[in-house]
């Protein structure tokens, strides 16, 4: 459960990210594909080269969904319901991949905003990403 302090931390650091959704999203995906190459199986039609339009486009979608989740942080279930259905029933993404992507997102935040990603903010952002992952996998059961 996210505390009010967690929510405040997430909203504050997300404010620094909001103008870079495509850039940071693509970087997180590239990191995931490199560190966890098995995740590429969900994207067989993607050009996996650095800075490809497909990775940038999907990265923007991922970060736009996270942006929406931040804006609806008190109703993650409502904000992510459609995506939960999509990932569980149509895409059938292995839930572990959400953890992999979350780790890569934390790295991207650390690279671009090292002074803002204090231990407390890091913990809050990790809790938020875990909550998002839990919502996205809630329809798997």
UniProtKB/Swiss-Prot annotation:
Domain of life from the UniProt record: Eukaryota
Record-given protein name: Hemoglobin subunit alpha
Keywords of this entry: Heme, Iron, Metal-binding, Oxygen transport, Transport
Lineage, opening ranks: Eukaryota, Metazoa, Chordata, Craniata, Vertebrata
Expressed in which tissues: Red blood cells.
InterPro entries: Globin (IPR000971), Globin-like_sf (IPR009050), Globin/Proto (IPR012292), Hemoglobin_a-typ (IPR002338), Hemoglobin_oxygen_transport (IPR050056), Hemoglobin_pi (IPR002339)
Primary role: Involved in oxygen transport from the lung to the various peripheral tissues.
GO biological process: hydrogen peroxide catabolic process
Residues annotated for heme b binding in this entry: 87
GO MF term set: haptoglobin binding; heme binding; iron ion binding; organic acid binding; oxygen binding; oxygen carrier activity; peroxidase activity
Residue ranges constituting the Globin domain according to the UniProt record: 1-141
Name of the gene encoding the protein in the UniProt record: HBA
GO cellular component: a single term: hemoglobin complex
Keyword Heme carried by entry: yes
PANTHER family: HEMOGLOBIN FAMILY MEMBER, HEMOGLOBIN SUBUNIT ALPHA
Pfam families: Globin
Residues involved in O2 binding: 58
Source organism of the structure: Caiman crocodilus (Spectacled caiman)
Subunit structure, interactors included: Heterotetramer of two alpha chains and two beta chains.
Family, similarity comment: Belongs to the globin family.
């Amino acid at each position: 459960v996210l505390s009010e302090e967690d929510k405040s931390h997430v909203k504050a650091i997300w404010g620094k990210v909001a103008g870079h959704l495509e850039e940071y999203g693509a970087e997180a995906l590239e990191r995931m594909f490199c560190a966890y190459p098995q995740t590429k199986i969900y994207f067989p039609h993607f050009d996996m080269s650095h800075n490809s339009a497909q990775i940038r486009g999907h990265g923007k979608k991922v970060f736009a969904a996270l942006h929406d989740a931040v804006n609806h942080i008190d109703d993650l279930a409502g904000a992510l319901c459609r995506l939960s259905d999509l990932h569980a029933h149509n895409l059938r993404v292995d839930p572990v991949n959400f953890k992999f992507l979350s780790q890569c997102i934390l790295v991207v935040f650390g690279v671009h905003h090292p002074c803002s990603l204090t231990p407390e903010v890091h913990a809050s952002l990790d809790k938020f990403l875990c909550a998002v992952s839990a919502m996205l996998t809630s329809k798997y059961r």
